[in-house]
Amino acid sequence: LLPNPSHLEAVSPVAAGKARARLQSLDPSGYLSWSGSGGQVVPGSCPVLAVQVHGDASFAAQGVIMETLALSKLPGFGVGGSVHLVVNNQIGFTTPARIGRSSPYVSDVMKMISAPVIHVNGDDPEV
């Protein structure tokens, strides 16, 4: 568990970096057992998983998310995937959603790396 400073989403690249460091510490020779060509970590093949929790407004509005996603496909930066839980808590209430982003969902930024996205209704967990 990593502490998040007052600057929203600043911990996102730190979490990815910590996962990457853990991968490297498990296999100092270059973690060849779960890397593909060019040193890119193959998704689903490594023993480390970064789990990150985000608020809706900060996930779509903070550029650090897009920067972290862009780095995830580079050799030397990939961690083989991470799980991002985006809570639609509407804490960023000072900006209405219709003018706070250019797409219907805050998770649409994940399309830049073709990551799968699952939308669920948190108000009715039994569904």
Regions found by a protein language model. Name each.
Residues 2-127:
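Glycine-rich ThDP/TPP pyrophosphate-binding loop and its adjacent helix/strand module
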